[in-house]
Structure formats: C-alpha cells, structure tokens
Amino acid sequence: MLLTLAGGALFFPGLFALCTWALRRSQPGWSRTDCVMISTRLVSSVHAVLATGSGIVIIRSCDDVITGRHWLAREYVWFLIPYMIYDSYAMYLCEWCRTRDQNRAPSLTLRNFLSRNRLMITHHAVILFVLVPVAQRLRGDLGDFFVGCIFTAELSTPFVSLGRVLIQLKQQHTLLYKVNGILTLATFLSCRILLFPFMYWSYGRQQGLSLLQVPFSIPFYCNVANAFLVAPQIYWFCLLCRKAVRLFDTPQAKKDG
C-alpha cells in the first residue's frame, strides 16, 4: 500500500513536470498556459489508459462477479489516490495560469476556480472520501469485478482530453476535432452510462435474473450508490451532446445564411 501510494505521488506530478518541460523545449512558440494545460491533459490520458487497462484485466480475471478476486482491484485504488490529489492541484494551476495576467488576488483566483469547477471538485472529493473507503474496506473481499468495471469508465478521458487540447490550440474547425467528438460521445455513453446496466446484467446473468429483476434483488444502498455515480455522468453527457449539436449545426447554419 505505502509503496503504491508513494509511486503514484511521484509518478503523476513527475510526468506532469516532464511533459511541461518537453513541450516548452519542443514548442517554444507556445505560451506557458498552453504547455501547462496540455500537460495536464496528457497526464489525465495516461491515467485513463492505466485505469482502463487495469479494469479490463480485472474483469477478464473474475469468473464470479461477486467473489472473483484480482490484486489490481485494491492496488490500483491506492495508485488512484495521489492522482486525484494531483489532478485537483493541476486544475487549480491551469486556472492560475489562465488568469495570472489579470493581477487577481490569490483568494479571488481560488474562488473562481471553485466556482468554475464545482462538479469536478465534488467528483474528486466523493472518490477520495466515499468510494475509496468503500473499495478498500467496506466491501470486504467482494466485488472486484465491479471495481474493474468502474475503472473502465476512464476510457472516454483521452478523447475528452484531446478535444480540450484541440480547443486550446484553436483547432475546432478541423476534421480531427469532429471525429474525436464522435468518439468522445460513443465512449462516454458506453463506458460511463451504459456501463451501469452492463453491471446489473452481469450480476443478473450469474444469478439467473432478468435485468429488470436485479434492482429488486440487491441491497437498496447499491441502487442509491449507482444512481449517485451515474447522475453526473448523464449531466456531462448532455453537455457533450449540446456541444456536438452546436458544432455540427454551425456549418449548416452558415450555408443557409
């Protein structure tokens, strides 16, 4: 545990510093803000690949969705804790870089950061203070399969990050941006929303239950927890859909005009 925590505490900030240094050396025309924001997205993508890979390994290794075990289901959670702390700081650093030319007081920058990122900060706090204790202690030796499923939700993150990078570089007009937008919607829908019916279906298949019977055959708090987890994902997916509609409507609107 301690070794994994220490490894994560060194790996993610170290990777961020390395990416920032490499970008400033290789792209001297980019501003410091560009380098910091893009480095943040690169680190997020690396974490997403590691989490998704861990999740797939866990899922494939668990023959029983309840009692199946794999060491990554616990060990990667310890690796995740330093990432969540690092990512919270990285988001604040991006806000500071974005507004540093405005000579704002640090307290005002912090308030704006908390205001602009309320949902994401809440998301990180829930993971650290609720999901980590559940995953590491409260669930006992059960449910590694479902922990692996939750890890695979990160599959959409590299596509989200690439979209943010393209926006930062003012490349919203490119074909790459549009294709990436479609992939973002597809992976977000499948891995962050449809993931939950898949977990219910997997449990039902093993227990001989239909998908509709599963919610009534598991503890009520499991349904409540899943509802709290999927609610922000649905909200974010709706925002992505609205953004996609605006993106693909713009050329048609200009043509009609």
UniProtKB/Swiss-Prot annotation:
- Alphabetically, which GO biological process terms does the record hold? lipid homeostasis
- What does the record say about its membrane topology? Multi-pass membrane protein
Stored Pfam families: TRAM_LAG1_CLN8 (PF03798)
Q: What is its main location?
A: membrane
> Where is it located?
Cell membrane
Stretches assigned to the TLC domain: 33-249
Tell me where the signal peptide lies.
none
Self-association or partners: how does it assemble? Interacts with GGT7 isoform 3 and SLC3A2.
The lineage's top-level taxon is Eukaryota
Question: In which tissues is this gene expressed?
Answer: Highly expressed in pancreas. Detected at intermediate levels in heart, placenta and kidney, and at low levels in brain, liver and skeletal muscle. Not detected in normal lung.
Tell me the keywords, alphabetical order: Cell membrane, Membrane, Transmembrane, Transmembrane helix
What is this protein identified as?
Answer: TLC domain-containing protein 3A
Which spans are transmembrane here? Answer: 1-21, 42-62, 77-97, 113-135, 142-162, 181-201, 220-240
How is this protein annotated for GO cellular component? Answer: endoplasmic reticulum; plasma membrane
